[in-house]
Amino acid sequence: MANILRTIIENDKGEVRKLTKIAKKVEGYANEMEALSDEELQAKTDEFKERYQNGETLDDLLPEAFAVVREASKRVLGLYPYRVQIMGGVVLHHGDVPEMRTGEGKTLTATMPVYLNALAGEGVHVVTVNEYLATRDATEMGELYSWLGLSVGINLAAKSSSEKREAYNCDITYSTNAEIGFDYLRDNMVVRKENMVQRPLNFALVDEVDSVLIDEARTPLIVSGPVSTETNQLYHRADSFVKTLSEDDYAIDTPTKTIGLKDSGIDKAEEYFHLENLYDIDNVALTHYIDNALRANYIMLLDIDYVVSEEQEILIVDQFTGRTMEGRRFSDGLHQAIEAKEGVPIQDESKTSASITYQNMFRMYKKLAGMTGTAKTEEEEFREIYNMRIIPIPTNRPVARIDHQDLLYPTLEAKFRAVVADVKERHEKGQPVLVGTVAVETSDLISKMLVQAGVPHEVLNAKNHFKEAQIIMNAGQRGAVTIATNMAGRGTDIKLGEGVRELGGLCVIGTERHESRRIDNQLRGRSGRQGDPGESQFYLSLEDELMRRFGSERIKAFLDRFIEEDNDVVIKSRMLTNQVESAQRRVEGNNYDTRKQVLQYDDVMREQREIIYAERYDVITAERDLAPEIKAIIKRTIERTVDSHSQLDRKESLDAILNFAKTNLLPEDTISLHDIEDLNYEDIKDLLYDAALKNYDRQIAKLRDEEAVREFQKVLILMVVDNKWTDHIDALDQLRSSVGLRGYAQNNPIVEYQSEGFRMFQDMIGAIEFDVTRTMMKAQIHEQEREKETESRTTAEQNISAQSTISPQDPIFKNVGRNDKCPCGSGKKFKNCHGRKRF
């Protein structure tokens, strides 16, 4: 272990030496740049662009370009980047993560690589965690970029499509991570290219990169729409039932946070709902509602996992930042179950139209870089998943903060009494204090205790996040006491007020350890910026979540000896700190494994999504007649259908083929059994294809002109693809939920998901081609003028009143296995198509 640590330290030192060498080159241009007039310095941007177009690389331009930004920053902002900031900028340009301590000027550091990469003209995205930071940084740093001749845009959720398009077309675009993801998904749902807002993804520089790429890695971005409303009564009935249960009726697995009914609970459910067998196949839907009601009532906690807003809405609380996640809803009916639990109006369930995780979203950029003060603990994950190195950057001034050893108490009550006493003592001498909590519930409790102790304070949590920046900016003033959940206020510096340095600087008090050492380090990092004095102290108890789930038995046994004598006994030792960090490492390892597994599952969706989105883009941007593609689709559909029917008895086979042709391919009076009964199957394919081409030409002839033909073709394909893709996403979600059970049968769930997901994707492609064929050949096309200016599908869809909504008389198929493909040619299994009634 010692040798490994020594190697890591030596590697870091080697990187710092390389970066120092490049930084000195940049500094070597300082006098030359200082001698330039404003006009000459501004002209450097066009010069660099021309040199880049003539073959010089961005690496070639780096020393001089960084020097230009440095001098421009001094003239425009009154700030001159230090050497360590130049070094951080070089790391960012190389697509890695410079670990820079709080207060070291990450925002200014980013200006140099952002400017350099914007010279290529392909767009640079500066990504922040919230709109306040995006607007603040775009306004402050935008002044510098504009002075240098680069355009700057801000992409906010409230902006219209045209405003978003304008922002993305700028050289530099500031946005939140969520909005970039949603814009990407929405772009792949439009019908016309001119309705897209993004350019191809080039270079993203992510602020607080660990928050976005690690903490939120498992959170999918989902674009969804309403589906047929499930009766709200079932949610209420399930909720009423689980509230009648005692603790003996269900079992909770604390480490995994899962819950299930015991036998006594099952008996009560069968009595309550008047059932013979709760787990009969007919009761699958009911068990789903009961499972969600159990989770809502006994796993999901008010003010920790969610809050109830003044508008009577359930808002999810981000477990890492303590902020509410506006617009997000728990999936699979859990949100509705919580709404029933809390007695607020139940909103309709929704159907996923498109989704993507941040992991796969940001891996699509040509180059990805990020900034943070705490990433070294997650170095393996950044390297393995994002191919990014973590390079620690030296501080401009030595860190003067004092980090005290943890204090461990036997109970929560004793711990909180000690916290309040410490805060009161420091407040009375004028030292500012920032109290960090993990949950809204804890911040409210400490706030009440401080009120009782007569200590004035501010509270920052998910309930009043709108005052975040103002509260944090005042947190360093003399006598200030601020309570904040987790890393609320991250990205806003806490500057010390007059006379505070002499009192020891800002004291950060953590009320419990987080699962991740990185989050604890972020809290500590609020104090001691730019060489300022400061302190940090963590208070723990044996009843804390981390200690309860993962704490060492040695610590518990050691503390038990003192509890009987004194309930306020406290332990302070290096052994304790080591034990806590050991527990955190175990949790971090578990979380990393989980995120890695999520990525393995999501990679299946990613590969399929990229194929579908690439095909969509090709259709949207096509300015050609799509007849060759549509005719090829018709041909493959005919071949697939005839091949699947050729396995049957000859008479039954011909009847099925004829039925397919009449209901999906041709006018009914244009083909009969007499036409195909003497032909072999290859000749039948040729006959049907020739007849289909004639029918295709008849259909197209009804349209007004070539433009109308192209519009009809595009909307037809996109409408079918989008409908099938949406259904496929839901099917994959259901597969993912069920495939875990296959592990009990000694099958690897991920391998099962990959193979089954691939088969389902192939089936979906067949179903898309079948529906395109049927809709093209059977649509009632009206010869009418259509408005060219419309931006929605509605006008074009009026020309596709396809008979896909009409159910023709079901044909009768014999000797078809339940898992065989349906002979009708839909691409679905027989049990899920025409065999549904039979099975």
UniProtKB/Swiss-Prot annotation:
InterPro entries: Helicase_ATP-bd, Helicase_C-like, P-loop_NTPase, SEC_C_motif, SecA, SecA_CS, SecA_DEAD, SecA_motor_DEAD. Pfam families: P-loop_SecA, SEC-C, SecA_DEAD, SecA_PP_bind, SecA_SW. Its cofactor is Zn(2+). One of its GO terms (molecular function) is ATP binding. ATP binds at residues 85, 103-107, 493. Its EC number is 7.4.2.8. SUPFAM superfamilies: Helical scaffold and wing domains of SecA, P-loop containing nucleoside triphosphate hydrolases, Pre-protein crosslinking domain of SecA. It is found in: Cell membrane; Cytoplasm. Part of the Sec protein translocase complex. Interacts with the SecYEG preprotein conducting channel. Has a central role in coupling the hydrolysis of ATP to the transfer of proteins into and across the cell membrane, serving as an ATP-driven molecular motor driving the stepwise translocation of polypeptide chains across the membrane. HAMAP family: SecA. This is Protein translocase subunit SecA. It comes from Streptococcus mutans serotype c (strain ATCC 700610 / UA159). The lineage of its organism: Bacteria, Bacillati, Bacillota, Bacilli, Lactobacillales.
